[in-house]
């Protein structure tokens, strides 16, 4: 059994090191904020052509019209939704939702859609979360349909995501601040859910999500959004050309109708390409 060193000099040195690390991290965070503010100031002073302003205005106008149509349609069919609520558990299915870059450059996401994206923790492109699809969640997903792709993942895809991308937030023992760490230890799962949920390994979490178990929400909220690779990366001329070609090939038609359906894709292939 290891004996803890109780030498006052060593304890004082450790305490000073922890204080120094904490101050260094605070200074680094302050520098990042200053750099971000400087970039934002430069971006705000950037010259914008009149044609760009008109294009952005029309795009935002169409997007707001789409949100308005969906909201109106959902209000009118609210009575049907109440009767369907009893069938939620029977008709529910698992979806994996990935946030994609905005379909139109310069588009400002409407507040209702932005709130749904924030609720799902999809604040950045190329991040994904598991969602339990029910009649109650369909209207919310329709609001954000231009900003996401969705589909039913296979058990193999879920396992691949956990093996390569699963991360959680933990409290650092030294700095007492939250930090992100990879979920690759069954002991962490057992310490977190062993007594309450009976989950003692990562495979138990995968089973809970895949089968839409009783503790689906607790497990999915504990795991941070999965960060996927961008389909095309880089900043050089070839990368810009590749991004343009990818954008043209994957251009999506967006319906303004209030009763537009939520389109689902082969999410397994999408995960394989960006995992």
From Swiss-Prot:
GO cellular component, one term: nucleolus
Chain segments annotated as transmembrane: none
A GO molecular function held by the record: rRNA primary transcript binding
Sequence ranges of Basic and acidic residues compositional bias: 20-44
GO biological process, one term: maturation of LSU-rRNA from tricistronic rRNA transcript (SSU-rRNA, 5.8S rRNA, LSU-rRNA)
Region of interest called Disordered, as start-end residue ranges on this chain: 14-45
UniProt signal peptide: none
Gene3D superfamilies, sorted: Ribosomal protein L30, ferredoxin-like fold domain
Matching SUPFAM superfamilies: Ribosomal protein L30p/L7e (SSF55129)
Location within or outside the cell: Nucleus, Nucleolus
UniProtKB keywords: Nucleus, Ribosome biogenesis, RNA-binding
Function text: Involved in the biogenesis of the 60S ribosomal subunit. May act as a specificity factor that binds precursor rRNAs and tethers the enzymes that carry out the early 5' to 3' exonucleolytic reactions that generate the mature rRNAs.
Sequence similarity: Belongs to the universal ribosomal protein uL30 family.
Entry-linked PANTHER family: 60S RIBOSOMAL PROTEIN L7, RIBOSOME BIOGENESIS PROTEIN RLP7
Protein name: Ribosome biogenesis protein RLP7
Species for this entry: Debaryomyces hansenii (strain ATCC 36239 / CBS 767 / BCRC 21394 / JCM 1990 / NBRC 0083 / IGC 2968) (Yeast)
